[in-house]
Amino acid sequence: MEKEWKKLIDEVENNRSYSSEPNFKFVDFIREKSTIEDKRAIVQEVERRIKLLMSMGLKNVIMTDRKGAIYEGREGLNPIKEEMAKITNFNKEKGTLAEVIKGADIFIGVSAPGTLTQDMVRTMAKDPIIFACANPVPEIFPDEAKAAGAAVVSTGRSDYPNQVNNVLCFPGLFRGVLDARASDVNDEMKVAAAYAIAGLVSDEELTAEYILPAAFDPRVKDAVAKAVAEAARKSGVARI
């Protein structure tokens, strides 16, 4: 784990803000008229994703590692965790994952198999959303999470609904970069890619087991490429 963090130190991006409004349709589907700003999220060691989510409106975030909640002043934090402690967990909540997850609306994990238990899910807010994306064995399997009360569950696996796979993003993102001859791949372009992917699931199609298109949906590449190229132009990094 420490080796992974050392590798990430060179990849820390500046936290930026956006004027565009996020469309978290799956959240609204589960909680009528709710907004992402109202939600409390527990995120396991995915610094870059946390910054992007926070820039899109998610405010109440607690980042955890194998020692529990990360908070400002915790001893033994490496530079990247010290940085994250300054912009997350403003109440300086302390404790293990099992302790800080109580009452949380969302869990996002890209960590290790079996780190989220059914007992933990039962202590979360009503109808929690679980992204258990460790591969090949997730933090918790979908059937276990749903039996414990989860409303929406995503994993990185193709044999379960709501697969989160980076193949949804990369082909179209790089096509958009090339089409715009972009000098950078900035956060605005990443956000645009996310919106484009989410937008391919219509309100009529949206269910708890279909919140994003399939990994090899032929519509995805072109939709993402168009959105990314446009975002590159609007953010000033396009060269054509």
Regions found by a protein language model. Give the residues of each.
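Residue-level detector of alpha-helical secondary structure
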Residues: 2, 6-9, 13, 24-27, ...
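Charged, low-complexity interaction regions
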Residues: 17-21
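Adenosine-phosphate binding glycine-rich loop
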Residues: 37, 132-240
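Glycine-rich phosphate/diphosphate-binding loop of Rossmann-like nucleotide-binding domains
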Residues: 37, 44-108
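Short glycine/serine/threonine-rich phosphate/pyrophosphate-binding segments
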Residues: 44-51, 71, 114-119, 138-140, ...
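A broad, structural surface signal
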Residues: 51, 55, 99-102, 118, ...
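Rossmann-like adenosine-cofactor binding region
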Residues: 82-151, 157-159
